């Protein structure tokens, strides 16, 4: 039996919290626990303890040509215990990503790109021959515990002259699959117009890059969130941040917050270049940006734990509860103002730094920023 006792921490409300882990599973959670003699301990003094962070929009296919990274570099080393690769691979090459996932310490899952080759070029959906229901279904049947959703990119640079046709086909494929998988939809430059995209989306679909500052975004020419966007949100359209190199605007995010349109999930859209050169850097930096916009830590943590676990049916993750996987993130917050920048180049002062200290994955402790 492998055990670990983590103590002297606090939850995001500030209440004391301690966690006993047995054989990779959370055995007990409380303020102070009775533990077996000789049980290894980890002192979390001065730190928050939460369920392990989940980044539901990353690009961690190390073999990809355009958007690539190492799962552990964007995962446990930055306080993230679970990453979901958002469409780097399709039916033709998801097997390779699956093999990479098994070599990582970080939990890795995949959203299968509707294009069978995934993102091998920027315009993977300019050719509709990339779409194959039989190939998609076979891949999902081969990796049912690895593929947790579908991904379609619907912007001019991706679809070429095909407009919303790839999205229409994606919705048909989604309906025809035996597996009930969520669909993440990337938005960006037009055509197609955002209104035409959202018209095809349904409650439970995930709109990623929701706070981009592009002309084809959620904010209309009068500086308000478009009415059709509000209606879709109220009916259950899921907002995912998907920060990325080009897809997060402080102004758009602030306007949405004023309109009470809050993201259900906070994701980074991280890959090698925007991790090293910004503006993303890490999921923790994305947390800092929502904090500066006025979100409270108690509002943000569910966006990177409970909510993505529910949406993508990671049934034993996302909660600091008995019986759940022993995936935890231990982190500090420090009042230390710093300049942060969005995808439009706008700089703002973030008053709080979020510093991950330890990632715990299946009961094993990893020091953030340190290699295995």
Across the structure, where does each feature detected by a protein language model lie?
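Active-site core of metal-dependent hydrolases
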Residues: 152-256, 260-277
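Metal-associated gating/positioning segment near the N- to mid-region
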Residues: 44-103
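Histidine-rich, glycine-flanked metal-binding segment
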Residues: 1-50
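Metal-cofactor-binding active-site regions of metalloenzymes
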Residues: 78-84, 88-89, 103-128, 151-158
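Divalent metal-coordination and catalytic microenvironments
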Residues: 9, 24, 46, 57, ...
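C-terminal cap of metal-dependent C-N hydrolases
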Residues: 325-371
């Amino acid at each position: 039996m492998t055990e670990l006792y983590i103590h002297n921490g606090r939850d995001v409300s500030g209440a004391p919290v301690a966690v006993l882990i047995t054989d990779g599973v959370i055995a007990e959670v409380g303020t102070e626990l009775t533990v077996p003699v000789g049980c290894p301990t980890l002192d979390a003094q001065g730190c928050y303890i939460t369920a392990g962070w989940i980044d539901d929009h990353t690009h961690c296919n190390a073999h990809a040509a355009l958007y690539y990274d190492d799962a552990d570099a964007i995962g446990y080393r930055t306080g993230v215990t679970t990453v979901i690769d958002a469409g780097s691979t399709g039916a033709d090459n998801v097997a390779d990503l699956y093999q990479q996932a098994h070599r990582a310490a970080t939990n890795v899952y995949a959203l299968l790109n509707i294009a069978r080759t995934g993102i091998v070029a920027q315009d993977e959906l300019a050719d509709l021959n990339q779409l194959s229901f039989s190939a998609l279904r076979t891949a999902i049947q081969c990796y049912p515990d690895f593929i947790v959703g579908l991904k379609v990119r619907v912007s001019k640079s991706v679809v070429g002259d095909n407009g919303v046709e790839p999205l229409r086909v994606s919705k048909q494929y989604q309906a025809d699959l035996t597996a009930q998988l969520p669909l993440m939809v990337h938005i960006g430059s037009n055509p197609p117009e955002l209104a035409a995209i959202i018209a095809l989306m349904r409650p439970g679909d995930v709109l990623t890059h929701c706070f981009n500052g592009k002309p084809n975004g959620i904010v209309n020419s009068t500086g308000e969130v478009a009415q059709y966007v509000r209606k879709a949100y109220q009916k259950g359209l899921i907002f995912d941040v998907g920060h990325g190199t080009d897809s997060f605007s402080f102004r758009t995010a602030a306007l949405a917050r004023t309109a009470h349109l809050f993201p259900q999930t906070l994701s980074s859209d991280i890959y090698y270049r925007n991790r090293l050169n910004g503006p993303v850097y890490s999921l923790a930096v994305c947390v800092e940006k929502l904090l500066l916009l006025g979100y409270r830590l108690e509002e943000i943590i569910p966006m990177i734990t409970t909510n993505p676990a529910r949406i993508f049916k990671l049934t034993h993750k996302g909660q600091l509860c008995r019986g759940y996987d022993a995936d935890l993130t231990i982190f500090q917050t420090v009042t230390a103002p710093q300049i942060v920048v969005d995808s439009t180049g706008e700089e703002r002062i973030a008053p709080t730094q979020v510093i991950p200290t330890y990632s715990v994955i299946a009961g094993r402790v990893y020091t953030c920023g340190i290699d295995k």
